[in-house]
Amino acid sequence: MAKEVSKVVKLQVRGGAANPSPPVGPALGAAGVNIMEFCKQFNGRTQDKQGKVLPVAITVYKDKSFDFVIKTPPAAVQLMEAAKTKKGSGEPNRKKVASVSWDQVKAIAEDKMQDLNAFTVESAMKMVAGTARSMGITVKGDAPF
């Protein structure tokens, strides 16, 4: 018989850097999870992604056991890395802060494909391009589709 789910906690934590301080500690403490056990497991599974922001969904069961799924870094973070900028624009419709190529958008879309609800790479590229547009990052060139 399957375990009964008590709570699902969603966080964004840097790879290999989970520790009991906020935001991880309070969120997991309120759910009744052994915080140090989560930190050890998370840091062990994300050693190869040191420093990258990773969304994680932690499923907490009634018996206080847990499991978690690590997703790919957010598209916004990947776009900022590709554009070599620290943050998006405060006024994306007026002030553009950087630009990326369609090849970079395609690489990000292929990386994010498992987490997006898109069936084709082209539709995933459109989602990533929309994220870029809302951040004040322009996509250079004509769309390849």
Curated annotation (Swiss-Prot):
SUPFAM superfamilies in the cross-refs: Ribosomal L11/L12e N-terminal domain (SSF54747), Ribosomal protein L11, C-terminal domain (SSF46906)
GO cellular component terms attached to this protein's record: cytosolic large ribosomal subunit
Domain of life: Bacteria
UniProt keywords, alphabetically: Methylation, Ribonucleoprotein, Ribosomal protein, RNA-binding, rRNA-binding
This protein's record includes keyword Ribonucleoprotein: yes
PTM info: One or more lysine residues are methylated.
Family matches, as PANTHER family: 60S RIBOSOMAL PROTEIN L12, LARGE RIBOSOMAL SUBUNIT PROTEIN UL11M
Complex and partners: Part of the ribosomal stalk of the 50S ribosomal subunit. Interacts with L10 and the large rRNA to form the base of the stalk. L10 forms an elongated spine to which L12 dimers bind in a sequential fashion forming a multimeric L10(L12)X complex.
Protein name: Large ribosomal subunit protein uL11
